[in-house]
Amino acid sequence: MPQQKLHVKSGDTVVVISGKDKGKRGKVLRTFPSEQKVLVEGVNMINKHTRATQENPQGGIVEQEGPVYADKVMVYCSKCQKPVRTGAKIDDKGNKSRICKKCGVEL
């Protein structure tokens, strides 16, 4: 199966549109295009049990973000104050940029 391109990039502010974290907003920390998943700051928190090591002699339970499917998030437009769909715009010099489909501002 060919790898599909994601509609979000690292550093984008996104809103979760479905699931247990619906309505939460956060920044994309990392993308996994082959799995169609993204890691969003403060969303889908999971408890990871860590073994005691020399760096962390105590060990214990660490709370961290888990990946969510990319189709469950939408890019957040700061001007519209809403999650929006994105479009592409090519300027005179041939540079491609992403724009908000509602208000037309560059994201």
Curated annotation (Swiss-Prot):
Gene3D superfamilies: 2.30.30.30. GO terms for cellular component: ribonucleoprotein complex; ribosome. PANTHER family: MITOCHONDRIAL RIBOSOMAL PROTEIN L24. Part of the 50S ribosomal subunit. One of its GO terms (biological process) is translation. One of two assembly initiator proteins, it binds directly to the 5'-end of the 23S rRNA, where it nucleates assembly of the 50S subunit. Belongs to the universal ribosomal protein uL24 family. It comes from the Bacteria. SUPFAM superfamilies: Translation proteins SH3-like domain. This is Large ribosomal subunit protein uL24. Keywords: Ribonucleoprotein, Ribosomal protein, RNA-binding, rRNA-binding. HAMAP family: Ribosomal_uL24_B. It comes from Natranaerobius thermophilus (strain ATCC BAA-1301 / DSM 18059 / JW/NM-WN-LF). GO terms for molecular function: rRNA binding; structural constituent of ribosome.
